[in-house]
A protein has these predicted regions:
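N-terminal auxiliary segments of SAM/dcSAM-dependent transferases
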Residues: 1-47
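Glycine-rich helix-loop-beta junction characteristic of Rossmann-like nucleotide cofactor-binding loops
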Residues: 75-83, 108, 145-146
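Class I SAM-dependent methyltransferase SAM/SAH-binding core
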Residues: 87-90, 95-144
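Residues lining the SAM
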Residues: 158
Length: 168
């Protein structure tokens, strides 16, 4: 996994249907394919991000192609920076519209990337995981990225909250 433990910041390793760190913290992978790495004290709220209706509405809009030119430009920029085995993180990935297409393109061109997406919305990540089963998805905040420093080669953050300190 490219993710780190949100409690101790140690690397997480996949063990069947969960991610585990050396300190013994364990995070179950949901049946739909994402893992929840958002600690309750990081937001102070019970419900996070977009609900199912909002995700469904946005997905329907995006599938009409209005943002395809932008998505294609992002992919073009990503390919310009591409290298073998690169790590890609989409911070605020939503339903995976940009993430899945970037991952698909890099895989088709045999870059063998490690791709992950985070979002604060479980509903959005359920859709993202359906769209792309090979990408790792986690419920997490852009303000507390669950990745090691300097471990990401390409960072996407499209229409998501910006946290400059986390993106350095």
């Amino acid at each position: 996994s490219i993710f780190c433990c949100p409690s101790c910041q140690k690397p997480l390793c996949r063990e069947e249907r969960r991610l585990v760190c050396p300190a013994g913290h364990s995070f179950d992978v949901a049946r739909s394919g994402y893992v929840n790495l958002l600690l309750s004290q990081q937001t102070g709220r019970k419900h996070h991000g977009d609900d199912k209706r909002m995700v469904k509405t946005r997905s329907a809009f995006l599938e009409r192609g209005y943002y395809d030119p932008m998505r294609q430009e992002l992919i073009k920029q990503g390919l310009a920076a591409a290298r073998q085995g690169m790590t890609v993180l989409d911070a605020g990935c939503g339903e995976g519209y940009y993430t899945a297409e970037m991952a698909k393109t890099l895989r088709e061109r045999e870059y063998r990337p490690k791709v992950a997406g985070i979002d604060i919305s479980k509903a959005a990540l359920q859709e993202a995981a359906k769209r792309d089963r090979e990408t790792e998805y986690a419920v997490a905040s852009c303000f507390h990225l669950p990745v090691a420093g300097e471990s990401v080669d390409l960072l996407l953050s499209v229409f998501a909250p910006y946290c400059g300190e986390e993106f350095l």
